[in-house]
Amino acid sequence: MLEEEIVKKLLEKQYTVTTAESCTGGLLAGRILNVPGASSVYNEGHITYSNEAKERLLGVSHETLVRYGAVSRQTAEEMARGAAKTAKAEIGLSTTGIAGPGGGTKEKPVGLIYVGCCICLLYTSKYGRWGCEKCDPGVARGV
């Protein structure tokens, strides 16, 4: 199962993960936490169904929510980034979408979901410490 592979990789790399969920309402966190060993890698989770909660708890910008909407790639990225920073985790995962049965539109139909992944790692070199942050669904494949 995917969640078992996620926990396995996190344990191998000694990374921590946190989640920020909207339409999944904690399902993602629950799936991860059902895997033995998850308590070593899972920091905390946020269920931020309202826009106000996304702004207050995760730092999603009001402008992003107005311009792109709560269900958007941009919001998913900001949710993942905010969750990782709040929890001081290396990885933030987020979900936002339209669960239904109502609320869908032609542009954003019921069932549309965006998954955000933000990887925040701190590297040390002879020049000092610096951070590298990537927010993109594709970065998860490299972990």
Regions found by a protein language model. Give the residues of each.
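Short alpha-helical segments enriched in small residues
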Residues: 1-143
